[in-house]
Amino acid sequence: YEELYEAAAKIKANHPEMDPLAFPMAMGGNFLSSFMAMNSGYGAGTPDSWTDGNLFPKMHQAPTVAAAKMMKKLMEYMPADALDYDFDKANTAFAQGNAAFTVNWNAYMPYVLDPDSSAVSDKVAFCATPGGPEGRYSALGGWVQGISSQSENKDAAFQLIQYISGKDRGVDFAMNGGSVARFSTANDSAVVEKYPFYPLLMDILKGYTGFGVYRPWPEIEKTMETYFHKVMLGEDPESTLLQGAQQVYVQAQRGGYNPGATGPKPN
């Protein structure tokens, strides 16, 4: 990330009309999506960089504070309204040639390679997520398909999921702009030729980090992003993130978790 900061300064000097960076930074999971790989890269842990093994929040600890300071530093080279940028807005800014570098989920990448939607479709290169002092990690996320307990056709619904997500459909789905998480698809020559970012998805095997996977996560995510935004707007990182961690702890208890039952509260 330090190298990215240095590169952004050079881009701004040579292209003052362009925003060197456009990250998804808004609420609603956008900020944490951009931040999670940085958080792990600065030593906050993996695959869950948000809590310890007993589900005590650790967003106030030194690694996350350092990562938040780095993100605040990078904001010098983001749009003035960077905290309003969601996945689509960041992707559009990049596709229109208004930003030099973006971080986003792979599902958004076909858009920037399509000449009908992107002004830079023939000028795009892809790289792994930037690393931090403690290594380089990839953000892991996705969607879940399920079958309603009220369904009258559960077997047919399951067969549909099997068909849609099956290996035989992977290449066709990817070639039509879909997001496929299959080794066979990521290594398919036709897919790689059209969408050269696919091999980079295999970096997930080198180290990954993700969202929380516990019941009150949606509420906790909103709280975390609220306090990270406060830091991005200039509030003191240490005290602000401590306040956020205290609120997250209460929310975890309301959600049915009692971290103190399985381990001591960290400093």
Predicted regions and their residues:
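Long, aromatic- and glycine/proline-rich binding clefts that accommodate carbohydrate-like moieties
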Residues: S121-A128, A174-K230, R254-N267
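Periplasmic-binding protein-like
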Residues: P16, I161-S184
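Short helix-initiation/N-cap motifs at beta->coil->alpha
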Residues: Y1-Y5, A82-Q96
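Paired acidic/hydrophobic, glycine-rich loop segments that form the ligand-binding mouth/hinge
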Residues: A100-W105
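Short, solvent-exposed loop/beta-turn-alpha elements that line the ligand-binding surface or hinge
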Residues: M25, Y42-A66, D114-A119, C127-S138, ...
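A bilobed periplasmic-binding-protein/Venus flytrap-type ligand-binding module shared by bacterial periplasmic
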Residues: L140-N153
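Glycine-centered hinge/linker elements that transmit conformational signals in sensory
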Residues: E6-K10, D52-L83, A125, T129
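Extracytoplasmic/periplasmic solute-binding protein
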Residues: E2-F56, A99
